Amino acid sequence: MIRGRLAPSPTGNIHLGNAWAFMLAWLAARQAGGKVLLRMEDIDPDRARPEYAEGIMADLRWLGLDWDEGPDIGGPCGPYVQSRRVQDYARVLDVLATLGAVYPCYCTRKELRTLAGAPHPGDLGAPYPGTCRNLTIEECSRKEKEGRRPAMRLRWPDGVFAFDDGLFGPQQAGGESCGGDFALRRSDGVFAYQLAVVVDDIAMGVTQVVRGADLLSCTPRQLALYSLLGAQPPAYLHVPLLLDATGERLAKRHQSLEIRALRNAGVPAANITGYLAMLAGMIPDFVPRAPKDCVGLLSTATLPTRPLVTPADILDRLKKGTSR
């Protein structure tokens, strides 16, 4: 059975761009007769807030997106909150250490910026140059006596990792194009997203991942972890991002396009989901449409591959429920 997931980060209220990705993930699972899991990715204690988690669940339900397992209703694979799963991440990190696949990195952020040199294009930043990759036990001990606390990095395996994305087709990358050896745990003990999401998806039996195209470039990193852990990765479908009228990616700073703000402004939920259905090519024109009425209509044949720009008058259009 297909097991898809919605995996919001409770670091703010969800916005129209989040709703776009979540609706497509929900539809992909529902029209395949599958289950939908909700997982709160609150792995970063400096940014995540419980009140945002509650608000996100309320907003998703208001939009008409439900789930079969999650933080509020439980399920066989819980807990469905990353901050309560850190022991699992520690255990898997120990497994990787036993395999010789990780090593301590004592580089400070300032040193990493210096090592990076010129600005590096792409979401993953400059490749890690391997400064700490082959430190001896004595060198590690000396750095720890200096008061340095190590992060833990993956020793990138040889070769490339390939996958067939549901929208963007065949992809492959490895080594420096993936940022080189990447951190699995920060020096302050916080586990990295890449490790947490793979451990969780394996434990929860996730077979289908639908998410924004901004995460396309980090997929080979996750495939490297799947390979080392001997687990089957899910099928991936990356969808284009929504941009504002100036061409910038929608983010949590766009408060006027938060689902909560749209709701408070009197925009009906079906207007929002109908607009998103039109963008996905599920319906020819913008009309109110609930997610449940779109089941069976999602197709990669009609999904755009380029980022989608929302017009400057998007709020007025959403209120009216029409593209005119």
From Swiss-Prot:
Keywords: Aminoacyl-tRNA synthetase, ATP-binding, Ligase, Metal-binding, Nucleotide-binding, Zinc
Keyword Ligase: yes
EC class: ligase
Official protein name in the record: Glutamyl-Q tRNA(Asp) synthetase
A single Gene Ontology CC term: cytosol
Entry similarity comment: Belongs to the class-I aminoacyl-tRNA synthetase family. GluQ subfamily.
NCBIfam families associated with the record: PRK05710.1-3, PRK05710.1-4, queuosine_YadB
Signal sequence, renumbered to the chain: none
Gene coding for it: gluQ
Upper taxonomic lineage: Bacteria, Pseudomonadati, Thermodesulfobacteriota, Desulfovibrionia, Desulfovibrionales
EC assignment: 6.1.1.-
HAMAP family xrefs: Glu_Q_tRNA_synth (MF_01428)
Listed Pfam families: tRNA-synt_1c
Free-text function comment from the UniProt entry: Catalyzes the tRNA-independent activation of glutamate in presence of ATP and the subsequent transfer of glutamate onto a tRNA(Asp). Glutamate is transferred on the 2-amino-5-(4,5-dihydroxy-2-cyclopenten-1-yl) moiety of the queuosine in the wobble position of the QUC anticodon.
